[in-house]
Amino acid sequence: MKKFNYLFLILSVLSLALTSCDKDDKESDTEDVYFEIDPSGSREWTAEELADELYGAEGSAAGEENAKLRKLFLENVAAHEAELCDELGTNGVAMGYIGYKYYYQSQDVNGDTRTLSARVVWARYRLFGWHNLDPDNLYIMEHPFITDNADAPSECTSFEMGLSTQDYLLISPDGLGYGINKEMIDPYQNHEVSVKNSLDALEAGYAVWKKYGSGTMEDDWKTIILGLSEGAGKALALHRYFDTHDDEASKWHFSHSFTCAGSYDPSCTWETYYDWGGTEYVAVIPMTIKSMLASYPDMLKGYSEDDFYCKKYLAVKSQIDALLAGKNMSYKEQDAKIKELLGTQTPTLGDVLSETFLDKNSGIYKAFVKCLEKNDLSTGWTPKHTIKILASKSDGFMPYASTEAIKNAFGDMVTVTSIANCDHSDICDLYHTAYTTVVW
């Protein structure tokens, strides 16, 4: 019940993040935007079916909290169905949802063209056949830190789809390293690449909706960027792009971002790990190293991957690499296996990193931090739209210091809702729950 109680304590604050307001004047030409639909990954849901997949079937063992969320979900759907009945002057309207898995073109860390995958979802209603609804708002959802490709947006019915319980258009990119590109390294915390991937997913997802959906947005629609954990940094990076490209912000009716538990200043996050002597989730260490080596080979020229690790870690590195590359375990399962390989339930940085890399005055450390600093979202721009952040002060994976860096940099442009005692998993669950229950 802890997470559920947290939810209702802060719903009034979180609801401030959900306002929308401009006429649908976006008439961008989508005819030349490449996309390809994957029929095997495209789905249709009734409201009941979506509720079952999100929260568990009625009477299942999904837990008391999920049962309450399921009830709220269906109550709000019923209220919206009643509104549609009044609007249409009839009875018997039933809400439903449709989602398309699609492929689109973007770029990898080397600037090479890649085909990526994503999912777009929107609401519809049934009355003598199915009819697409005009979306109120467009949401871009950057997925959280995931270790199992089955949790990629295009592969599953994810919590973010709870946003579609009214008339929303939801676009969720898999990003590099997941979906069709699951064999690739996740360019973790490389915000330049993630922004390019997300913009291309947005263009292609919108084109999919224009072809298969209603093709018309409601008056006063806005684009809102969402993201949690790994996706929070991606979301704020996309926010920065819009705030430094006025034409794009206007084109997409950009409103604001609402993120949770992210690494917005990667060098601050990394230095906090050093201050702590470790992190709640040890796999983030090799994932970050692999990403920086792949993303900035010139800046890390002369250093091999092995240079970052101690002998103890190197002895099991091939096994850990296989776990990371497999992308077929939950993060808890993967974390437990890595700790087993390291022979400790409380691994420190000394169990992973070399003495040289642990030295903040070493060349390898300074070069690595410079790579992270290229992705610092707390400097180099001035926000024009509100940044809303949910964070835990006791998050052992995504340090609160990173949220503080954004608040300190941008002051009143940033609204932070903080929880004192909540781990990373719980704060992410709270974010999902809050958005699923507040936005209708």
Task: Give names to the regions the model predicted.
Residues 271, 364, 369-371, 397, ...:
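C-terminal catalytic histidine-bearing segment of alpha/beta-hydrolase fold enzymes
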Residues 204-280:
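Primarily recognizes the serine-hydrolase "nucleophile elbow" in alpha/beta-hydrolase
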Residues 27-126:
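Catalytic-loop region of hydrolases
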Residues 110-117, 121-165, 174, 181:
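Short, surface-exposed "cap/lid" segments of acyl-processing enzymes
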Residues 188-212:
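Alpha/beta-hydrolase active-site loop
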Residues 17-20:
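C-terminal motif of bacterial Sec signal peptides marking the signal peptidase cleavage site
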